Amino acid sequence: IRDYYASRGLGDVYKRQTGALLCLDVTEAVLDEAIASGCNLIISHHPLIFKGYKSITGKDYVERCILKAIKNDIVIYSAHTNLDNAPGGVNFKIAEKIGLKNVRILDPKESSLIKLVTFVPSAQAEEVRNALFTAGCGCIGNYDSCSYNTEGEGTFRAQEGSHPFCGTVGELHHETEVRIETILPEYKKGEVIRALLSKHPYEEPAYDLYPLHNSWAQVGSGIVGELEEPESELEFLKRIKKIFEVGCLKHNKLTGRLIQKVSLCGGAGAFLIPQAVRNGADVFITGEIKYHDYFGRETDILLAEIGHYESEQYTKEIFYSIIRDLFPNFALQFSKVNTNPIKYL
């Protein structure tokens, strides 16, 4: 679910990690904090490297951070657009802070799903199917273990040098098989195929992979949800300003509408304004909106620009809860460095 352009990190991923510093951005001050606290792993939302480098000389802060991380044997891992797109990610954390219910993806991701079709002897179909489900197949919305199964007849002739599970070398064999169809995220393809090959009884399992253009309702950009009770525009904006400690909250003209259906996207999410309007949202909250994006929207929707840093500052809490659940005894620290480069008078 990571977008193709997103960088992921720096350093030796096989190195034993003794402690992790959790942050939004990687800066020289954050690296100094990691060194001082004995953390040899930094987990950030925004990646340090956004473009390719042909030389690293220390001429800017990114190059200085790269050199400092390498010299001090610090690994940097960044979960950027994958955390933006994921259920339970950045936007869901914002929704949690605001108190939204019935939260769902505003702009579901497309072309990220694959259909797998394979053919298995009837007696082994259940075992193979369960292995596929365990590897990540068959999840559709609030349902798992989803598949479609039809029985048919497969034929093959084993050649010299083969060791067929059924049939005889040199003779045409007919076998009653089950055609299993199921769905999976593209990023799980390798894991799923390994599971299929490990459980399928045939030497040469037949399987097909089909790219799908379906929307993936559980993954994508932005979210939309509802407040328990409607609020006035001013009441809502003041509450948002306080929750996210916003120094300067920008918004378009107040029209007296009540706010109940809320759409949002952490970071630079102005590209989702049309989707928010189409979804009938009363307000769209994001970190950055360009000047011209405000024009012509007064009657459509309330726009609220709270700042890029402010909208994503609680990302550290997501990292903490995920890692703490998986590794309860691993040393985790929240960075105390405010990396927001924007200041307000």
Predicted regions and their residues:
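Single conserved hydrophobic/aromatic residue that forms the stacking wall/gate
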Residues: I1-Y14
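Divalent metal-coordination and catalytic microenvironments
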Residues: R8, A34, I42, I94, ...
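Active-site loop-to-helix "anion-binding N-cap" substructures in soluble metabolic enzymes
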Residues: D12-S44, L48-E110, V120-P121, T168-H173, ...
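Active-site metal-binding loops of divalent metal-dependent hydrolases
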Residues: D25-V26, H46-L48, T81-N82, A123, ...
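Positively charged, small/polar-rich N-terminal and surface patches that mediate targeting and assembly
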Residues: K97-L234, V246-K250, L254-L258, F271-I273
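Conserved beta-sheet core of the metallophosphoesterase superfamily
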Residues: I289, E298-G307
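C-terminal functional extensions of proteins
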Residues: I306-L345
